[in-house]
């Protein structure tokens, strides 16, 4: 306190200094809090990126192996599809059961390792991201653009397409369920009442 300052002025001066110091501390706390939040966000982004890279590396590592196994899966599928299920021979029946069990176990192993089968149902809409059209046929059972038949199942690995499903697609103009209705014929403006053919003109003056 100087000779000119009163005790009240001295107290006010000290209070002003304290107020400024408090404001400075508040700004520092806010800055530290913002920095901590940014560090936390960066850590979370780093964690997610590491997980994504790990999944990508895992998918890449087994992709070639999975693709090599698809041939075996296709052969098993064809074998079960062509098996004589009405055979009375116990040996043939047991053989068919064995092939079906092997195919089921292989598909189970695929699914456990992230390899998902793409086998669209009849009538399902063609998806260019998952399907490959190898032929088009007119159909009265499936609307145009729908899957008529799966010629070879496709597969995707952890969201990545390994092989598209080879399918036959209903051609344009197919009249299956869901096909757009034919537009109604426009009325003939020259038709007489009750008829749809052109009426006669009055040629009298």
UniProtKB/Swiss-Prot annotation:
Pfam families: GrpE (PF01025)
Any one GO MF annotation of this record: adenyl-nucleotide exchange factor activity
Record region (Disordered): 172-205
Compartments it resides in: Cytoplasm
Assigned keywords, A-Z: Chaperone, Cytoplasm, Stress response
GO cellular component, as recorded: cytoplasm
Compositionally biased spans, kind Low complexity: 177-195
Keyword Lipid metabolism: no
Disulfide bonds: none
CDD domains named among the record's database cross-references: GrpE (cd00446)
GO biological process: protein folding
Family, per entry: Belongs to the GrpE family.
Classification via PANTHER family: GRPE PROTEIN, GRPE PROTEIN HOMOLOG, MITOCHONDRIAL
Subunit structure: Homodimer.
General function of this protein: Participates actively in the response to hyperosmotic and heat shock by preventing the aggregation of stress-denatured proteins, in association with DnaK and GrpE. It is the nucleotide exchange factor for DnaK and may function as a thermosensor. Unfolded proteins bind initially to DnaJ; upon interaction with the DnaJ-bound protein, DnaK hydrolyzes its bound ATP, resulting in the formation of a stable complex. GrpE releases ADP from DnaK; ATP binding to DnaK triggers the release of the substrate protein, thus completing the reaction cycle.
Protein name (record): Protein GrpE
Organism per entry: Caulobacter sp. (strain K31)
Biological classification of the source: Bacteria, Pseudomonadati, Pseudomonadota, Alphaproteobacteria, Caulobacterales
Gene designation per UniProt: grpE
